[in-house]
Amino acid sequence: MSRKQLALLEPTLVRQALLDAVKKLSPMVQWRNPVMFIVWVGSLLTTLLAIAMAGGALTGSATFTAAVSIWLWFTVLFANFAEAMAEGRSKAQANSLKGVKKTAFARKLRAPQHDATVDHVPAEDLRKGDVVLVEAGDIIPCDGEVIEGGASVDESAITGESAPVIRESGGDFASVTGGTRILSDWLVIRCSVNPGETFLDRMIAMVEGAQRRKTPNEIALTILLIALTLVFLLATATIWPFSAWSGNAVSVTVLVALLVCLIPTTIGGLLSAIGVAGMSRMLGANVIATSGRAVEAAGDVDVLLLDKTGTITLGNRQASAFLPARGVEERTLADAAQLSSLADETPEGRSIVVLAKQRFNLRERDLQSLHATFVPFTAQTRMSGINIDQRMIRKGSVDAIRRHVEANGGHFPADVDKQVEEVARQGATPLVVAEGEKVLGIISLKDIVKGGIKERFAQLRKMGIKTVMITGDNRLTAAAIAAEAGVDDFLAEATPEAKLALIRQYQSEGRLVAMTGDGTNDAPALAQADVAVAMNSGTQAAKEAGNMVDLDSNPTKLIEVVHIGKQMLMTRGSLTTFSIANDVAKYFAIIPAAFAAVYPQLAMLNVMGLHSPSSAILSAVIFNALIIVFLIPLALKGVSYRPLSASAMLRRNLWIYGLGGLLVPFIGIKAIDLLLTLSGLV
């Protein structure tokens, strides 16, 4: 993946974010964040008081009130800046995608075939169902499905990956994306969307996040922050009459400063930025999430359904041996296996043809001259083959061939069953070959488990995440590979229906399930899963069913998606802990200063030894504003993440962000108080 990464504090983004922070001072924007809206109202009130004091309309220190007002406005501006920086990063990423969109003309075909009459029309005039022809050098004008032809396609503008990919009619590699370029040959494409609905348009809309909806956890935390704010607002409002009754009324400026320091402004100011940054980090991993809800769900996942091929194993199974049934020559088995694989373009199919050629010098034959009919593999039949004259050759899984043979009046030999078990015990995949009602033998396919995958699964297990391997292999093969890879469970001989049933079973137990998929047959399971990562190379149906799209089409990315989701949740939790701990420490600065005249006994709480009530209040307000600035990089980048158990993670965060949140204000407020005192500003 070669997409350009943005610096954490890109200068151009910082400049734009500063302007946006000022624009966000509008009350129409501020009211969306109740905590910061209270600060905004307090800033406005103290500003009016400072003006009135300066004009002589009110008694009091105009200088002190103005200083408090300025830093309250800075508090609002810094919170706005944090959100604007996160949004700016997303918009910059969206702008890079907008550069992919180009105004172009399309060759619209009057009939769905290569040699049909062509009309040249603007690409934006194409509608769902229109058929277009694209040739080498052309930009694909719309999202669609290839209905004829095959071509090499450069998708680097979308995926960031420079290596071209093959797109062809039929199968799971027929989906194309508008904005990509044809490098060779030609394609006939049926458009699957209307203008403005393309994958690229949806990517841009998702990345810009202008209408980003709050996630459930974010809403719950916002409600908690509002509740705390209301409690402190009521508490502060009741203080004035008590102090007035005692004869030493606390000024409105001090009460506003007290309220702002009591309410959780730190997390209140950073909450939106954390959510936007989470989606931005997901894009940094070349994964497009449809919403923050999807990213958050990834952090809560506790079951991962992982495809064996390409995720757990290297995915390039190769034919390693022909094992004939009793009474069958190995050459006869090899000949039938090669015939059944002549039109099979999968790596496994090509390896069978090559092995037959190497062992017995069997050459490929022309299917057209043989008047043969190829029978393609489907997820339902789980076998493929060829019909030549009176010969009906099939290869496939053990159960599929068993049903096929018995349906044709034959029986499955016991010696082949034993061979199947032996091959499976060795971790290889047995493919059974049959001609008509007769079983000819087995093809042994070997795959290799990826290095380091067992350790990654052990880390996931520590975090309380269950890993389940999904494979079309039989149970013995699946069990051998599962044991070697270290997964917790497996689903063998998987069908789309079995995957869907498994997801529903886990969800009925209260678990959150994540999975990947790329084919149309994966769409029902993707739609059911809580986190569904569709491969960009997959079909349109799969991409529409998922709530994330992996531009690299790498099934292993699911583990990284979960890590990013957990990092977002950890960042939010850590900064919430830090914010609340911060507030506790600030009480020791501002409460003695605010009420020392009313209740002299509160002076014993001035454990920091702050110079004066004015310097204490101003120091607390300044610290309250500056801490938001210092935490912006952490909110954008996320806290450091380690794969630990929930209890270990909680202990670690309480030590770092809980204790840190208590200590930092003591140091920071005392340092600011010393600077104010030494400079003579108070």
Curated annotation (Swiss-Prot):
CDD domains documented for this protein: P-type_ATPase_K
CC per GO annotation: plasma membrane
Main location: membrane
Residues where Mg(2+) binds: D518, D522
Record membrane topology: Multi-pass membrane protein
Residues reported to bind ATP: D344, E348, F377, T378, A379, Q380, T381, R382, M383, S384, K395
Catalyzed chemical reaction(s): K(+)(out) + ATP + H2O = K(+)(in) + ADP + phosphate + H(+)
Location of the active site: D307 (4-aspartylphosphate intermediate)
Membrane-crossing segments per the record: 35-55, 62-82, 219-239, 254-274, 588-608, 616-636, 656-676
Compartments, as annotated in UniProt: Cell inner membrane
GO molecular function per UniProt: ATP binding; ATP hydrolysis activity; magnesium ion binding; P-type potassium transmembrane transporter activity
ATP-binding in keyword set: yes
InterPro entries per the UniProt record, alphabetical: ATPase_P-typ_cyto_dom_N, ATPase_P-typ_P_site, ATPase_P-typ_TM_dom_sf, ATPase_P-typ_transduc_dom_A_sf, HAD-like_sf, HAD_sf, P-type_ATPase_bsu_IA, P_typ_ATPase
PANTHER family membership: POTASSIUM-TRANSPORTING ATPASE ATP-BINDING SUBUNIT (PTHR43743:SF1)
Subunit structure: The system is composed of three essential subunits: KdpA, KdpB and KdpC.
Family stated for the protein in its record: Belongs to the cation transport ATPase (P-type) (TC 3.A.3) family. Type IA subfamily.
Stated role: Part of the high-affinity ATP-driven potassium transport (or Kdp) system, which catalyzes the hydrolysis of ATP coupled with the electrogenic transport of potassium into the cytoplasm. This subunit is responsible for energy coupling to the transport system and for the release of the potassium ions to the cytoplasm.
Protein name per UniProt: Potassium-transporting ATPase ATP-binding subunit
Species: Klebsiella pneumoniae (strain 342)
Lineage: Bacteria, Pseudomonadati, Pseudomonadota, Gammaproteobacteria, Enterobacterales
Gene: kdpB
